[in-house]
């Protein structure tokens, strides 16, 4: 696994590695260099979600060993290389869609983007959602991911 993991560092652009480092650091709540079940619990809790231990354990089992940054990169490298990015994006939005409506409150999404991770500015927010499918304050993330990935598919 170490060979595969170190190969990831040479495959990904530096900017992407830096973005992944920021994501890893955000998830690694106790800053010990590893993502464990407690880190995941805290992260999801800060997002207003409470997945059970079984779900969290399943996530962690994707790694063949302790989930340090190199392993984190290794696991996500295929997704980052574009193999299933539309699905990955849709799934990321779906994590916040507890009722599975395929739509999210646009103000909630904006709040997350302003206050978590990269902390979008008002201008970045305006540009991101300029063409976004928003009706009645609801952001249609399935249409949005199809639109930005160019598949033209409206349904999963």
Swiss-Prot record:
Keywords in alphabetical order: Calcium, Metal-binding, Motor protein, Muscle protein, Myosin, Repeat
Modification Blocked amino end (Ala) occurs at: 1
InterPro entries, A to Z: EF-hand-dom_pair, EF_Hand_1_Ca_BS, EF_hand_dom, Myosin_RLC
GO molecular function: calcium ion binding
Annotated transmembrane regions: none
Residues given in the record as Ca(2+) binding sites: 28, 30, 32, 39
GO cellular component: myosin complex
Domain EF-hand stretches: 15-50, 84-119
Keyword Iron applies: no
PROSITE patterns linked to this entry: EF_HAND_1, EF_HAND_2
A Pfam family of this chain: EF-hand_7
Presence of the UniProt keyword Metal-binding in the record: yes
Disulfide bonds: none
Protein task: In molluscan muscle, calcium regulation is associated with myosin rather than with actin. Muscle myosin contains two types of light chains: the catalytic light chain, essential for ATPase activity, and the regulatory light chain, a calcium-binding protein responsible for Ca(2+) dependent binding and Ca(2+) dependent Mg-ATPase activity.
Miscellaneous notes: Smooth muscle myosin from the scallop adductor muscle contains two kinds of RLC proteins, A and B.
Annotated protein name in UniProt: Myosin regulatory light chain B, smooth adductor muscle
Species name: Mizuhopecten yessoensis (Japanese scallop)
